[in-house]
Amino acid sequence: MQRDFRWLWVYEIGYAADNSRTLNVDSTAMTLPMSDPTAWATAMNNLGMAPLGIAGQPILPDFDPALGMMTGIPPITPMMPGLGIVPPPIPPDMPVVKEIIHCKSCTLFPPNPNLPPPATRERPPGCKTVFVGGLPENGTEQIIVEVFEQCGEIIAIRKSKKNFCHIRFAEEYMVDKALYLSGYRIRLGSSTDKKDTGRLHVDFAQARDDLYEWECKQRMLAREERHRRRMEEERLRPPSPPPVVHYSDHECSIVAEKLKDDSKFSEAVQTLLTWIERGEVNRRSANNFYSMIQSANSHVRRLVNEKAAHEKDMEEAKEKFKQALSGILIQFEQIVAVYHSASKQKAWDHFTKAQRKNISVWCKQAEEIRNIHNDELMGIRREEEMEMSDDEIEEMTETKETEESALVSQAEALKEENDSLRWQLDAYRNEVELLKQEQGKVHREDDPNKEQQLKLLQQALQGMQQHLLKVQEEYKKKEAELEKLKDDKLQVEKMLENLKEKESCASRLCASNQDSEYPLEKTMNSSPIKSEREALLVGIISTFLHVHPFGASIEYICSYLHRLDNKICTSDVECLMGRLQHTFKQEMTGVGASLEKRWKFCGFEGLKLT
C-alpha cells in the first residue's frame, strides 16, 4: 500500500522596524506523494530550486514510517542534511512565491506575489483568535477546520451567516501561521460557481478570553518574579543573631568568665548589654552586674594599646610606601636620563627611524609616569604638613570682629600660598639634586642641554625665592595692620568706657537738679505727658490720624509705629491716647461681628474746649 507524505514549505514573512523582511521556514502538511518525481520537481521549481534530475526513480522508496525505524533515529524530513533538498536562502528583494495548497474538500490558490502583503490591525495582547473573512457561501465548518487545522490545534470556531468566522487556537504562535493564508483564493472541489469560491482575509481579532488568559499569565509571571526576588532577598539577608539566654546566677558566672577572655569578649558584652536593657539589674544582682561592667572596663586599656599599635603600623607602612615611591622615582629619573642621553646627536644619528620613534615614545611614557609618581609623593608630603597645620589651628581660639576675621582669612591664604611655594621649592631642589646625581653618573662631558636645564631650574628657583620673599613681606604687612586694628579696638573700648562714665555722672547731676527743682517736677507730674518720648509719640500719632480722618484701629497705629521703633508696646500707646482725651477720642464702628474700635484725632475741637 502506497502511503503519501504531505509536505509544504511555508515562508513566514515578518516586517521588522527597519522595513527589512526576515524569512522563516516551517513545514506543514500538503498532499504530495513521495513516489511521484514529477510532483516533487514541480514543487521545487515553484520554490526557485533546481530539480534533482532523477527521472523515473522515486526520491524515497515506498515504506511504512511506523516500521523499520530504529531507536534513536529521527524521522526523515526534507530539511534533513544529506538529502540535497534544503532550499537556499532567498534574497530579501525577491518576492516570495506561495504554493497551491490541496485539501480533501477544497483547494487554496496563492495570491499574486507582486502585490503588497495584506494589511492587518494591531495585534492585541495574548491574541489567540483570528478573524477569517471572504469564505465561500457554501463553505461549512468542516471545511474551515480542514483548512486551518494545519496551523495548529483549534479550540473553538464561531461561524457567521455572512461569510466570515472567528477561530480560536490553542497557542499564540498558531495565529501567525493562520495569517499566512490571508489573500489565498479558496475553491470548493472543482466547482467554479461563485458560491463555491472566495478570497480569504485573515486578521487579528479581539477576544475577552484571550485577554483574560494573557492577564492571568502576566499575573502569574509577576508572582513568580516577586517570589524569586523575595527568595533572593532572604538569601542575601544577614542571618538573625542568636537568642540571648535569660539571666541567672549560673549564666552570670559564665558571662563574667567570657568577659575576661579577649576572644569571647564581643559575644559576652552583647549578652551583658541585652540583660541591662531587659531590666535584669536589681538590688540582688547589682554587685554581679558591677563586676561584669568592671571586667568590660578593663578592656579599654587593651583596645587603646591595640589602636596605638595599629596607628604605628600604619605610620610605618606609610613611611615604607614613601621610601619605596622615592626609590621608584629615582629609578624613573635614571631611565629618563638614559633616554635623554640616547637622544643626543652623537648617539641619535646611529639609530634607525623606527628605533628613534620607539625611543621618543618610551621617553614620553616614562616622563608621564615619573610626573604622576612625583605628584603622588608631593601629595603625601602636603597631606602630612596640612595635618600638622590643622592640629595647630585647632589648638588656637579666635574671637575677632568682622574686619579682623577678613584680615585673618587673607593671612591664612598667604600662609597657604607660602607653604605651596615652599613645597614647589623643595620639588625644584629635589630635581636639581637628581640632575646633579645624573651628572656624576654619566660621562664627565660638557652637555649644553643639561647646562641649559640647570640654568632654567636655577632661574626658576630664584624667581620662586623672590616671590616667596614678596609673599612674606605682604604677610608681615597684614600682620602689622592686624595689630594696628587691635590697638584701635582697644582705644575705642576705652573711649566707650569713658563715655559711659560721663553718662552716669550726667544722670547723677540730673537727679540732683530734679531734687532741687521739686515744684517744677510736681507740675510735670501733673501733666498727662510724662517724658519727651511720649510727646514725640503724641505728635507722630496726631500726624498719622490727621491723614486718616475716619480713624484707625490701635493695631493699625501700632503697626505704623513699629516701623519707626520695634520696642513700642501696644498697651502703652493705648494708655497714652486714653490719657489725652482732648486730643484723641475712641469711637465704635460697625454692627455685630464687624464691630471695631477706632481712634480719631480731635485736637482742633479739644483746643476750643480747653
From Swiss-Prot:
Changing G592V: Loss of activity. Changing C510A: Loss of activity. It holds the Pfam family ENOX1. Glycosylated. GO terms for biological process: electron transport chain; ultradian rhythm. SMART domains: RRM (SM00360). Its EC number is 1.-.-.-. Has several properties associated with prions including resistance to proteases, resistance to cyanogen bromide digestion, and the ability to form amyloid filaments resembling those of spongiform encephalopathies. Belongs to the ENOX family. This is Ecto-NOX disulfide-thiol exchanger 2. The gene is ENOX2.
